[in-house]
Amino acid sequence: DSVRDNGEDYILTRQAIVDYIELYLRTPADFHDSRFAPLIATSLADLPRTLVITAEYDPLRDEGEAFAARLDAEGNEVACFRMNDGVHGYFLYPSVLSLVRDTYRLIAHFLDGDPLPKPGDRPWLTLLGTD
């Protein structure tokens, strides 16, 4: 569980997540609104081509990857990449410039309309040429 494993000492903490949720919610009923939590939507079918990028040490990693898996299961065109050694918001930190550069290259491939990898492919190596 990424919240348990990465919810302390990696910039975004478990408590900060709770605090942000409380700031975002208008009423407790929002917890049951798929606009607040897309994973609870009855259907995620027929959504646009989607790129999901998660970070290895992000407490929200599992949620992002579950969203990508659900999009895939419902027939959407989706690719999901976990950025090794990344923390929540890593692309804002110049100390991880090579990781940021790779992330932007991945986004550029997606925006250019390059084909998304199929399950079982090695998309990191294919798209970024880092073999």
For each feature predicted by the language model, list its residue ranges.
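Alpha/beta-hydrolase superfamily serine-hydrolase fold, recognizing
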Residues: D1-D131
